[in-house]
């Protein structure tokens, strides 16, 4: 699993797309375009606003859809925040925020096979993640984003810092990244990115993913 993480470049966070009812087709398209890791994150989504929070059984059902799609495309499937859901869904990856479960507690729940990542938002958090127990970390937001309302964006300076201190540990730039902004992110030193709307809001998710992946691979 660690070798797959090392080669991963494009990480997608998607909601359950309940208001559209097209999660399976969307996931297949995005993964066919080159997404390496696909994460279910429904918090703050249009579906949540319309239908309410995703209940555990429904979250597991959505996880099964993404897990099946990821397996078909030799990609990895991630769960956000919930170590119990990650274990039940046999997720490849669990992603934690700074205020979620401690990494050692989460790993005790998921078991050793599940990779664990963490969000970082300042230099101290980046430095801690670079030498800590997480398998990867995310750096940002690079720009303000509606998926994290009210959060100050540390910007590309934090990306530059991560590029200097991360060493061999995989890390991903995150927050407001799209095809237009990607060159700036690459110039700051990132070689892996997390995106949301750049693919979820695209008319052609496969094409959007393929364009991003092509630029990422060209920068290696």
Curated annotation (Swiss-Prot):
**CC cofactor note:** Binds 1 Mg(2+) ion per subunit.
Q: Does the keyword Transferase apply?
A: yes
Recorded hits in InterPro entries, A to Z, give: Aldolase_TIM (IPR013785), ThiamineP_synth_sf (IPR036206), ThiamineP_synth_TenI (IPR022998), TMP_synthase (IPR034291)
For binding Mg(2+), which residues are annotated in this chain's numbering? Answer: 81, 100
Cofactors: Mg(2+)
Q: Where does 2-[(2R,5Z)-2-carboxy-4-methylthiazol-5(2H)-ylidene]ethyl phosphate bind?
A: 145-147, 176
Molecular function (GO) terms for this protein are:
magnesium ion binding; thiamine-phosphate diphosphorylase activity
Tell me any Pfam family this protein matches.
TMP-TENI
Where does this protein hold 4-amino-2-methyl-5-(diphosphooxymethyl)pyrimidine?
39-43, 80, 119, 148
Q: What does it catalyze? A: 2-[(2R,5Z)-2-carboxy-4-methylthiazol-5(2H)-ylidene]ethyl phosphate + 4-amino-2-methyl-5-(diphosphooxymethyl)pyrimidine + 2 H(+) = thiamine phosphate + CO2 + diphosphate; 2-(2-carboxy-4-methylthiazol-5-yl)ethyl phosphate + 4-amino-2-methyl-5-(diphosphooxymethyl)pyrimidine + 2 H(+) = thiamine phosphate + CO2 + diphosphate; 4-methyl-5-(2-phosphooxyethyl)-thiazole + 4-amino-2-methyl-5-(diphosphooxymethyl)pyrimidine + H(+) = thiamine phosphate + diphosphate
Give its E.C. classification number: 2.5.1.3
List the pathway annotation.
Cofactor biosynthesis; thiamine diphosphate biosynthesis; thiamine phosphate from 4-amino-2-methyl-5-diphosphomethylpyrimidine and 4-methyl-5-(2-phosphoethyl)-thiazole: step 1/1
This protein's source sits in the domain of life called: Bacteria
Q: Please provide the record's keywords in A-Z order.
A: Magnesium, Metal-binding, Thiamine biosynthesis, Transferase
Biological process GO annotation list?
thiamine biosynthetic process; thiamine diphosphate biosynthetic process
Give the CC-aspect GO terms: cytoplasm
The role this protein plays is:
Condenses 4-methyl-5-(beta-hydroxyethyl)thiazole monophosphate (THZ-P) and 2-methyl-4-amino-5-hydroxymethyl pyrimidine pyrophosphate (HMP-PP) to form thiamine monophosphate (TMP).
Family stated for the protein in its record: Belongs to the thiamine-phosphate synthase family.
Tell me the protein's name.
Thiamine-phosphate synthase
Species the sequence originates in: Mycobacterium marinum (strain ATCC BAA-535 / M)
């Amino acid at each position: 699993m660690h070798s797959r993480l090392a080669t991963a470049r494009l990480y997608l966070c998607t909601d359950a797309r309940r208001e559209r009812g097209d999660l399976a087709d969307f996931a297949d398209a995005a993964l066919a375009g080159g997404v390496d890791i696909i994460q279910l994150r429904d918090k703050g989504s249009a579906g949540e606003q319309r239908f309410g929070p995703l209940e555990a059984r429904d979250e597991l059902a959505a996880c099964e859809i993404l897990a099946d799609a990821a397996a078909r495309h030799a990609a990895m499937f991630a769960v956000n925040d919930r170590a119990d859901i990650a274990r039940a869904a046999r997720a490849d990856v669990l992603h934690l925020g700074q205020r979620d479960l401690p990494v050692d507690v989460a790993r005790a729940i998921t078991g050793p096979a599940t990779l664990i990542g963490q969000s970082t938002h300042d230099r101290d958090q980046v430095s801690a993640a670079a030498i800590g127990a997480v398998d990867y970390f995310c750096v940002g937001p690079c720009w303000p984003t509606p998926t994290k309302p009210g959060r100050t964006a540390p910007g590309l300076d934090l990306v530059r810092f991560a590029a200097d201190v991360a060493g061999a540990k995989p890390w991903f730039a995150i927050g407001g990244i799209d095809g237009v902004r990607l060159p700036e992110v690459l110039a700051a030193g990132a070689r892996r990115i997390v995106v949301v709307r750049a693919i979820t809001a695209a008319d052609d998710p496969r094409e959007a993913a393929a364009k991003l992946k092509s630029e990422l691979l060209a920068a290696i």
